[in-house]
Design a protein with these regions (language model features):
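Short, flexible beta-strand-to-coil junctions
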Residues: 22-28, 76-81
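Structured surface patches comprising rigid loops and adjacent beta-strands/short helices at the edges
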Residues: 41-46, 81-102
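Extracellular/luminal recognition modules and glycoprotein regions
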Residues: 35-38
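A short, Trp-centered hydrophobic/proline-enriched beta-strand micro-motif
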Residues: 13-25
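C-terminal low-complexity, charged extensions that often adopt amphipathic alpha-helices
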Residues: 89, 101-123
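Acidic, aromatic-enriched beta-alpha/helix-loop junctions
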Residues: 40-82
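Mixed-charge, Lys/Arg-rich low-complexity intrinsically disordered regions
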Residues: 1-8
């Protein structure tokens, strides 16, 4: 389902989201889109599990540009365990989980994935 920047920002602040978006910088040999598990929910990210399992760390500084003017969002990428900028020109919300639901889903479906499985997930 296509989602606007403001709606996605609201979802990210409250949930963990699975999204697919158009890459800002195309890469040779990989699809034009990128799939991501991401979250901006600071309660989840700053929790013990967020810091130990997801390796969350605060950014320390804000972006050097106005993300709204660029139609982008900066979010925590759960697989890459780092902050990422996503292009909101074409974003699909595939799934979302509340913080309470997320850890069960993560432990059952995502934690067992190998590095190759995670790359396959991100490129589909």
């Amino acid at each position: 389902m296509k989602i606007s920047r403001s709606s996605l920002l609201n979802e990210l602040n409250n949930n963990v989201c699975e999204i697919r978006f158009l890459r800002r910088t195309p890469k040779d040999g990989v699809p034009a889109t990128r799939r991501m598990l991401c979250c901006n929910n600071l309660n989840l990210l700053n929790s013990v599990n967020g810091k130990t399992v997801l390796n969350f760390r605060s950014s320390g500084s804000g972006p050097r540009y106005n993300t709204a003017n660029e139609n982008t969002i900066i979010t925590w990428d759960i697989f890459m365990q780092n902050w990422r900028t996503i292009n909101c020109d074409s974003v699909d919300l595939i799934n979302k989980w509340s913080p309470d639901q997320f850890w069960d889903i993560f432990n059952e479906s995502f934690a067992p994935l190998s590095a190759d499985d995670k790359l396959l997930f991100m490129n589909t």
